């Protein structure tokens, strides 16, 4: 690796991460967001459960019924396994952040390895890899807490050996292995690679090219079959599109469950990804959300085409164009995307693809491949080449800054004090949390306190919730009554002692009320304000008794008897007053 590419990589790294290096062990890279909380839960679960007993069924949420965690989320666990040694050695926060740095570096190396297939110089390959690793798609995934979708080293190695598959059986085997690893990392990346892989194959006239690539695909299928068989044979896949409403020119965001979903798509003219949503009157609107392509990327790729060899140009376009076509989603500028619409209608695995814009991952691979020859084309003017390299990096960073993708934020690893108190209970007795389904941040809290909880992942969606748990929420007057009271509504039925004891018989000991929902404004931007905490607290005490612990962050009750879980700790600080507003209409407190 030469000096200029190394300095460009260092510049990109410091501009994206330098501001948080001093606090690398105090928080997690990314924003305080639902996917980030879920990722930390999965990494914790993988480290402490799956790696010990290889069981994916857990009763840590939706206790005591539990959930098949990987059936619930698609079975992708490889990133959790890879992150486990870092968490074990360095702790959850520092271990995760070091793992993210490794993601950046392996993506740089993977792109450099792929470009080596096209006789691109080491200088140009390292520089292109450095820029590629900080593209807006990957930064968005890391910012929002989805490292699974940012780990591309296996996909890049797959493309490396897929390109040369006609050259013998070794690249065939390696292409199959790395395609399998790509799928195990994130199933949809293996699926989204298919259109581009078919295009590369169709335009490769080398003897044995088709035969060898069919063999590589078959090997990948065999390798992932033990992990995918359960999903392939299951009739209970939630969230499938109702494809009776789809045709070559029409589509609908409705699922078979009758739930409308937002479809994540890409608008190349705006350079933004966003969601197709449907208003109640049936009007469909595209709502741009974040930048997914930089202007400088297009400039570099267009300039690189001038210097590209026919083989590099062919492969780059074969990866870029089909990926862009998928990423457009169901329509663009009012024009139906017929290939995509028909693929979703007739290919079952695509009927759960709510996010076609994730095909942009390979669109960016294509852009990088096409841009790389530019730097070799300038080799006769080394000083000019170096100046342009730094200029491109600066333009890259300016665009990232404008798009609010650099620098990456960091969120604190600390959990509310009330949950820190709960963590002192070494019996790990189950907990009933209120308000119910207020925030998925409680999944992250669980990685610290390690108690089973009544709610769980996507707990307000019946598709993802165990049927007995749903019945408990509607039929048990104690459970339903507490949920209503915490939501500032009077129960519609009298809470009975029998139903209260039914929760005790399931093993529950604690009821925790998080005070953050009652702040004004709410602690989480997406939350509905609840500003009548004093009334809520008073009504809950009628059924739960006096709290055993309270501080500014929350309240703990032991309604079936017991003392504070942190009784040996120093006395909790006094509760802070919260704004109150009474609204007794429609049964509200």
Labelled PLM ranges:
Residues 1-22, 215-219, 306-316, 387-389, ...:
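Start-transfer (signal-anchor) and selected internal transmembrane alpha helices
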Residues 9, 99-118, 123-204, 217-220, ...:
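Membrane-embedded helix bundles of polyisoprenyl
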Residues 20-118, 123-156, 280-282:
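Active-site lumenal/periplasmic loops and adjacent helix-entry segments of GT-C-fold
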Residues 29-32, 138-149, 249, 285, ...:
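Membrane-helix boundary/interfacial segments in multi-pass membrane proteins
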Residues 33-49, 225-305, 348, 356:
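Periplasmic/ER-lumenal interhelical loops and adjacent helix-loop junctions
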Residues 198, 214-222, 369-401:
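Signature aromatic-anchored transmembrane alpha helix within multi-pass, membrane-resident enzymes
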Residues 202, 219-222, 293-326, 374-377:
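Hydrophobic, aromatic-rich transmembrane alpha-helices
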Residues 243-252, 287, 394-589:
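Extracytoplasmic
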